[in-house]
Curated annotation (Swiss-Prot):
Other observations noted: In plastids the F-type ATPase is also known as CF(1)CF(0).
Domain of life according to the entry: Eukaryota
HAMAP family in the cross-refs: ATP_synth_b_bprime
The gene coding this protein: atpF
Protein name per UniProt: ATP synthase subunit b, chloroplastic
Amino acid sequence: MEVFMVSFTLLLGESTFSLGEGFGINTNVFETNIINLSVVLGLVFTLGRNFLISLLDARKETILRNFREADQRAKDAEARLNLAKTELELAEKSAMEIKKQSVLSAELEKKNKNTKIEADTARFKQTQQETLTVQRQRAISKISKQVVNSAITQVKQKLKSSLDSRVQTVINNYKIHKFIEYKPPGN
């Protein structure tokens, strides 16, 4: 305590601080009353302590409030991060599903196109074959008609040149004889 008093005296010097006419603070430690000094120090410690405690409590509340707010913001940020991760996973799954569907659609479309091309090709070949068959039949029919007409013309010419009444009589007699000998089946 003596060290404190000596230090206090040296700091303040021997000056007197006066607040008014009848009241004053004597800064000389040796001239002051220990009771007055203890009262002043008690007031300083009591009031200062209460002020310091209230200041520290306010600071503590501010720090705790800031900590709770920061903790809440961290929880909110973590919740938003988890939500964003979930949405990202859903988006990735959706993208993969869309990709799969597009690949399957493309393959199905390709298969359908190939099937249609094969069917069109088969139909074209069948039509081509039918056309060739029809043209062949027409050609055969035309040639047959020409051959028949030519044969008929030749037969007519031969008949005109070789048919006379005597040959005609022989042919008629032969046909009559065949007709007479004819017996219907079942008789």
